[in-house]
Amino acid sequence: MFARNQSGSQGGAFYLASPGWRSHISDSYFVQNRATQGSSGYSDGVIFSLLSGNTIADNVSSRNGVYTQMGESEYMVSTFVNNTFVNNRLTAKSSSLSDKTNGGSAIYFKSGSGSLNLVNNTIVGNTDSCYTTSGVPSVNFNGSAVHVISGKVRLVNNIIAGNFSSAAAAGEVYLGESASLQNSTYNLYGGADRMNITAKSTDMVCRNYDRCVQDLQKVLDSEIVDGKLSLLLSDNGGFVPTVKVKSVACGNNNLNVLSAAALRESTFYIDINDNGVYTDNLAVDGRGVTRNTTGSMIGAYEYTGESGMEPNVQQNSIRVFVSEDNLYVISDSFTVGYTIYNLSGSLQMKGEAVSGRPVDVSILPAGVYMVETNDRSGGIEFTKVLKNN
């Protein structure tokens, strides 16, 4: 957890300026951090960065980007998968701004001809505001939740809606003159007048901001306060608090529209784990819950039924654990099939284990993994495991 950190400049929770480095931040909770820019995090020059399964909530920046990614290399790639950005604020002062490049109540990206990839994120209820000393909205401001000054952008399977901006024609997505939209598929956007990109054929667009807030309140665990959406975080399984999905129906749109193909790297052509191939798929949501490949939910949270009952990520009939460099599967069945994914949903290993006998997993780096097991009875279970070395 990164909580209540402060900086008078960049990087409230962390500051990373290491050209050529690679970073992977997963299953972390960034809450109530403050900074001028990058209150939850500021990264500059990292050649590849992956954020997966994080919750970034209630952070405040006073100029640019609650999460800020900077760089100049054309090879720079920043990929966000299964993250939740809610209730963050960018509160700029009109007198301190020189142009309309400021914004990013969720993400601020400026990277020459580098790439920003957003896949299955929930970016809702964030606020960009900038007023003059007389309390009038500044005309020198286009603040949006996703604010891209330069670079190539791919938006896939996200909820980017219900974000407020004091700017007249902003709120959800803003692309500067040096930014280009490469792809937009199966996203929910808050309104055509709230972004300067054109939604594509599979995207869904709310009628207007007020209607979007009302519709989203029925979909996500939240409340409406002074006309704005305030998201409610809770323990829904996984490592960090998340926003529970109550329904798949958002106005006239159903949000559980993703087929198995829509969750494959080869379909959206984003290498979500930077292993150099496009053969993996997004098997789990931000909590580690298996996605329904016949109708998966866009955003970071997989909807599993109106009853409110969520599947337990770890069941008891098959016991799975890691000790040193070995995986152990304990079951009443003699053999059990296993598949190991990282928390981005990328397949790492697959095979058959004999109950009680070690499986060598030394090729896997330290980290948290999701293990799918299936026995002869047809039962399938999922277990999160931690590999320490």
Locations of regions flagged by a protein language model:
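Short capping micro-motif at the N-terminus of alpha-helices
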Residues: 100-101, 293-295, 350, 383
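C-terminal outer-membrane/trafficking sorting elements
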Residues: 310-389
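Short coil/loop residues immediately preceding or within conserved phosphate-binding loops
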Residues: 25, 38, 104, 143, ...
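Conserved beta-strand and immediately adjacent loop positions that scaffold enzyme active sites
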Residues: 157, 186, 266-268, 280, ...
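Surface beta-loop-beta hairpin patches that serve as ligand-binding interfaces in beta-rich domains
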Residues: 250-308
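Residue-level recognition of short loop/turn positions
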Residues: 53, 82, 120, 157, ...
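Predominantly extracellular beta-rich ligand-binding scaffolds that present long acidic/polar faces
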Residues: 1-8, 14-254, 292
